[in-house]
Amino acid sequence: MSAISSLVPSRFLTLTAHLVIVITIFWSRENNVLACLPINFTPQQFSSRDTELIIALSVTLGLFAVEYAGFLSGVSMFNKTQSLLSVGAHASATVSLLFFLFEGWDCSLYWWIMSFCSALPAVTEIIIFIAVFGWKRKPL
């Protein structure tokens, strides 16, 4: 099995694992919101932090849509650079978000995880979209 053909399933699996963890955090975000608050908090503070986490998770889901669109349409499926970046970023995000979920990390750390592990691959995916559809280059 060549390296490029093993990158395709690896990319799909890490992307899907990251998506599953984000959805899990979305469903059970109350504990993470409580970890972001001081011991004595007001309902307004809870609502504010909950809204912040909902926005961050929603942006992440939008970035997943971009990356799945490029991957499943075949535009970047066999691009080695994008596949390696995506596998590394989403594997890192999977491990980091597991710690975020189970250790109750602060909510501000989620923005860092999202920017490096979700936004970076999505931006490179958009660049590949522009190169393929705008400049009519081959997807490889």
Swiss-Prot record:
Q: Where are the transmembrane segments?
A: 7-27, 53-73, 84-104, 113-133
Q: What does this protein do?
A: May play a role in cilia formation and embryonic patterning.
| Cellular-component GO terms for this entry | membrane; MKS complex
Q: Which residues are glycosylated?
A: 79
Traced from the root, the source organism's taxonomic lineage reads: Eukaryota, Metazoa, Chordata, Craniata, Vertebrata
GO biological process entries: non-motile cilium assembly; protein localization to ciliary transition zone
Where is this chain primarily localised?
A: membrane
Record's protein name: Transmembrane protein 107
Q: Which InterPro entries match?
A: TMEM107 (IPR029248)
Q: How does it sit in the membrane?
A: Multi-pass membrane protein
Keyword field: Cilium biogenesis/degradation, Developmental protein, Glycoprotein, Membrane, Transmembrane, Transmembrane helix
Q: Where in the cell is it found?
A: Membrane
Q: Name one Pfam family in it.
A: TMEM107
